[in-house]
Curated annotation (Swiss-Prot):
The lineage of its organism: Eukaryota, Fungi, Dikarya, Ascomycota, Pezizomycotina. Homodimer. Keywords: Cytoplasm, Glycolysis, Lyase, Magnesium, Metal-binding, Stress response. The gene is enoA. Its main location: cytoplasm. This is Enolase.
Length: 438
């Protein structure tokens, strides 16, 4: 079925920054996708095209990317008369049209918007939900797997004020019997945590960060973990809800000294207190021994390969590569060869097409890795990643706290999918690292 129209416009993300929205029109109707954007972005990511005109949107406009869709990509795709169900051919065509390895010509934000909107058109033409279409494209087996929601309930690092260096502390309801029960448990812990934060750190500690987590003026990781552990206990889930961290350590790595500065938000940080990767690895291990930590993301900087391999050899929890791998096939291949981590954080806008995202997941699965599908800190009401997570059987999704509508939109979509699938789906639960084999 031919595409009759492709139209892009500039809309806003959850941080008030412009982003690209794409409409694709076929005989089945209008199919729309909105592209997210990140705050702490890896330098090896596909290129997000921003206008750079400081007089508008502080340089963050996306009018060039929108124009690229409306004047270059759209007309070329329509002229090519591609079948919307053949996602890999469409994405290959988009990449050829751009002609650069990192999509810097037309912009990954322009290309991804078109790729995802066409995927929705493909699902509609087949008369199936988007997750089912993605499952077909990826060749995943049945039953469907509903992911464990990794809920970012406490923010530090680049996402928050206080001195806390680590970026995200997540609760993991992996012993729940279903997705909906896991989400309920998470919401209950979140409310206890909010009340505790206000009580201990004052009323403003209940204010939420970019991803819905609280951001009290916390100094250390121990302090954050104690607060979360107490909230879990108050909610009655001790031993049932686990914890995950996203350290985002590239943000506080000192490449000259090859050290990590846990006081990086302090301009007068004392260099004698900066840590070597071995010292930082020991800190993680001591935290994992004391708290119920099941997953650590980006424990080391994106090009500190030696540190990753060192840590991997001696750890038994999930080690997730985000800035390290940036959903990029070449980086994933290198991480597999060097035995750097055992799970991929999958962000569709890091690579820029649905087909390449599916391939990144398959490459990771092939080496026994886990895959966690992720939002970005600048999100929208678009729920595509919920369908991607179910379609790929990823077993884990990270989409913020159970707060702020752009975060809940994804979680609510999985609730709908759970209801629709009924007995034809299983909850990943404690098998979240191996859910592709369930």
């Amino acid at each position: 079925m031919p595409i009759s129209k492709i139209h892009a416009r500039s809309v806003y993300d959850s941080r008030g920054n412009p982003t690209v929205e794409v409409d694709v029109v076929t005989e089945t109707g209008l199919h729309r996708a909105i592209v997210p954007s990140g705050a702490s972005t890896g330098q090896h990511e596909a290129h997000e095209l921003r206008d750079g005109d400081k007089s508008k949107w502080l340089g963050k406009g996306v009018l060039t990317a929108v124009k690229n869709v409306n004047e270059t990509i759209g007309p070329a795709v329509i002229k090519e008369n591609l079948d919307v169900k053949e996602q890999s051919k469409i994405d290959e065509f988009l990449n050829k049209l751009d002609g650069t390895p990192n999509k810097s010509n037309l912009g990954a934000n322009a290309i991804l918007g078109v790729s995802l909107a066409i995927a929705k058109a493909g699902a509609a033409e087949k008369g199936v939900p988007l997750y089912a279409h993605i499952s077909d494209l990826a060749g995943t087996k049945k039953p469907y797997v509903l992911p464990v929601p990794f809920q970012n309930v406490l923010n530090g690092g680049s996402h928050a004020g206080g001195r806390l260096a680590f970026q995200e502390f997540m609760i993991v309801p992996d012993t729940a019997s279903s997705f909906s029960e896991g989400l309920r448990q998470g919401a209950e812990v979140y409310h206890k945590l909010k009340a505790l934060a206000k009580k201990k750190y004052g009323q403003s500690a209940g204010n939420v960060g970019d991803e819905g987590g609280v951001a009290p003026d916390i100094q250390t990781a121990e302090e954050a973990l104690d607060l979360i552990t107490e909230a879990i206990e108050q909610a009655g889930y001790t031993g049932k809800i686990h914890i995950a961290m996203d350290v985002a350590s590239s943000e506080f790595y000192k490449p000259e000294e090859k050290k990590y500065d846990l006081d990086f938000k302090n301009p007068d940080s004392d260099p004698s207190k900066w840590l070597t990767y071995e010292q930082l690895a020991d800190l993680y291990k001591s935290l994992a021994a004391k708290y119920p930590i099941v997953s650590i993301e980006d424990p080391f900087a994106e090009d500190d390969w030696e540190a990753w391999s060192y840590f991997y050899k001696t750890s038994d929890f999930q080690i997730v590569g985000d800035d390290l791998t940036v959903t990029n096939p070449l980086r994933i291949k290198k991480a597999i060869e060097l035995k750097s981590c055992n799970a991929l954080l999958l962000k569709v806008n890091q690579i820029g097409t649905l087909t390449e995202s599916i391939q990144a997941a398959k490459d990771s699965y092939a080496d026994g890795w886990g895959v966690m599908v992720s939002h970005r800190s600048g999100e929208t009401e678009d729920v595509t990643i919920a369908d991607i997570s179910v379609g790929l059987r990823s077993g884990q999704i990270k989409t913020g706290a159970p707060a702020r509508s752009e975060r809940l939109a994804k979680l609510n979509q999985i609730l709908r999918i759970e209801e629709e699938l009924g007995e034809n789906a299983v909850y990943a639960g404690q098998n979240f690292r191996k859910s592709v084999n369930l």
